[in-house]
Amino acid sequence: MTEQKRKIEKLTGVKGMNDILPQDAGLWEFFEATVKSLLRAYGYQNIRTPIVEHTQLFTRGIGEVTDIVEKEMYSFTDALNGENLTMRPENTAAVVRASIEHNMLYDGPKRLWYIGPMFRHERPQRGRYRQFHQVGVEALGFAGPDADAEIIMMCQRLWDDLGLTGIKLEINSLGLAEERAAHRVELIKYLEQFADVLDEDAKRRLYTNPLRVLDTKNPALQDIAQNAPKLIDFLGDESRAHFEGLQRLLLANNIPFKINPRLVRGLDYYNLTVFEWVTDKLGAQGTVAAGGRYDPLIEQLGGKPTAACGWAMGIERILELLKEEDLAPEQEGVDVYVVHQGETAREQAFIAAERLRDTGLDVIFHCSADGAPASFKSQMKRADASGAAFAVIFGEEEVANGTVGVKALRGAGAEGEKNVQQTVPVESLTEFLINAMVASAEDGDD
């Protein structure tokens, strides 16, 4: 019997954990460059924490009765030492842990920012993934409403820098612990009247985390949630003054907002100010950035009592908006694609490509796909497909004469009759290319 060749199974990525392909990477780089420039303008410093943390960090920090801890964390036991570990579902707790562990606050407040992947085990859908990326800020050691207003202003400035419109700000105050406790008693009394019509999620939260019932997305419970006792009515003088101070600063800076009494956020560490930036352009996943104040968290994780506030935004959702509004920038090609014909020409072309890179130009050198020399036509086709501005052509005749061919592929120089191959002395190649690119850019601006 003839032995058939076994078919090798094709492996695929994990559902909800997506590859970022080269055609999309340019948009990511554009966003990252824009947000990093903004963060520098506000004096924030980058911090990078591990993807894996002790599970206890999140159960203590986020709260044991939150959806994230109960249902969404990727947790495992380390086979080497039995430690319970978790792939970070968010990064505020990790930044706070790092600031305590490394005594970062001993010499005063800190403005920190992070960017990277987070992980939650949930059903993948548009705008919601199992691996997703966030950029966030943490302002540690600032107690006043001015810090709250500043981090909110940063978001508005980012929307402006990106050209995004239609992202609206909603704010609320969760008050202090004793105010939330008084509200909790009345809220449970109110919700108990509807125990027979509450869905399973609401029943589960009724006595463990009743505040989250107000955030229900179930259409059948909207009237119940809308008419529930409002936490804002339980605020004391200190909490009310903080919230009013925030509103004054936002109004003074022409930032429109809506007070949403049902805005409670899904993490237990928040107090006083909470906020969300929302859009109606992404369907059900309309929150693109969210945050607030978390004054108790640093002490809760073993540090000294320290005020703090921050936000996180979902990068995938913002990129979706950029595409939706046709704001994605065109992906730029390299400056030069080096083409060659003949062995001697190939060696000279290889050397020239390195010298061009020495001057700061971006250069692709044509490498053989199969080990055999490629035709001039196929190389020029590759050069055009690469998006390069110019093709630099080395042939045996040009090398013998100490010259090189240059042909414009993009920009004003590639248009009309003037798009002919020019012969340039090798020693003048760099100067010629730089002058040609400057001239092409100026023609394009006219």
Swiss-Prot record:
One of its GO terms (biological process) is histidyl-tRNA aminoacylation. PROSITE patterns: AA_TRNA_LIGASE_II (PS50862). It catalyses: tRNA(His) + L-histidine + ATP = L-histidyl-tRNA(His) + AMP + diphosphate + H(+). Keywords: Aminoacyl-tRNA synthetase, ATP-binding, Cytoplasm, Ligase, Nucleotide-binding, Protein biosynthesis. The keyword Hydrolase does not apply. It is found in: Cytoplasm. Its EC number is 6.1.1.21. The keyword ATP-binding applies. It comes from the Bacteria. One of its GO terms (cellular component) is cytoplasm. It is an enzyme of class 6 (ligase). Its main location: cytoplasm. One of its GO terms (molecular function) is histidine-tRNA ligase activity. Pfam families: HGTP_anticodon, tRNA-synt_His. Homodimer. Belongs to the class-II aminoacyl-tRNA synthetase family. This is Histidine--tRNA ligase.
